[in-house]
Amino acid sequence: MMPAKLQLDVLRTLQSSARHGTQTLKNSNFLERFHKDRIVFCLPFFPALFLVPVQKVLQHLCLRFTQVAPYFIIQLFDLPSRHAENLAPLLASCRIQYTNCFSSSSNGQVPSIISLYLRVDLSPFYAKKFQIPYRVPMIWLDVFQVFFVFLVISQHSLHS
């Protein structure tokens, strides 16, 4: 189990990372919940991915998450593959695994324990699905809406 203080630090890191380097996300409303040592985190996201410095946000998040690497394996699901190429060394150094959302599953679903949807308020959905592993339907990309998913899976502690 992750120490309570570290859990709070993780939430603050997520919040500051989401707002880092872009005015678009400054006033976002956040939903954070804990279930044991898993994190649920949801915030609204700007419609067009190319208008937001996603790479800068992810770099900040990866660097800050180095401290919790013994407690978490973090999986990042992102639609445009170009971000994976640029961030691959940084992601690897923090045990953050990248998966292209469109190629991750042949049946159109992404295996998930805790899914972090940006831009969409899914608090009622989380309330129902909070305590159990579940599968999340693929969210398709259109011209004005881009969704990408942070998948945070709690696995091995320092003592396991």
UniProtKB/Swiss-Prot annotation:
Keywords: Membrane, Transmembrane, Transmembrane helix
Keyword Transmembrane listed: yes
Subcellular localization, as worded in the UniProt entry: Membrane
GO annotation, cellular component aspect: cytosol; membrane
Transmembrane segments: 39-59, 136-156
Membrane topology: Multi-pass membrane protein
Family: Belongs to the UPF0479 family.
Protein name (database record): UPF0479 membrane protein YFL068W
Organism, scientific name: Saccharomyces cerevisiae (strain ATCC 204508 / S288c)
